[in-house]
Amino acid sequence: MDRTTELLKVNKLNNSWEFCFKNFQDESKKYIVDKASIAINGISLTIANVSADSFSISVIPHTYENTNLKFINENDIVNIEFDYLARFSERSKN
């Protein structure tokens, strides 16, 4: 686990769910990139959208039904692991 963040909102869409999380306002923000991988509570997912204050993931029904995501509620704190390649790339710059 690298960090924790707050679930801001869950939107039920036609055939998926959109989970919107609070974005980081420090050096961790550099790892939150559109289409990058991110693990939330141990589940490897893809970041769908990023804004200054939040980032979101889209979840298909199979993932929703077979993971702990269906038990997460708005304002809950979740565990975050950043993409390994993003961390490696950042380290190699230094």
Residue spans for each PLM region:
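Conserved loop->alpha-helix
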Residues: 1-94
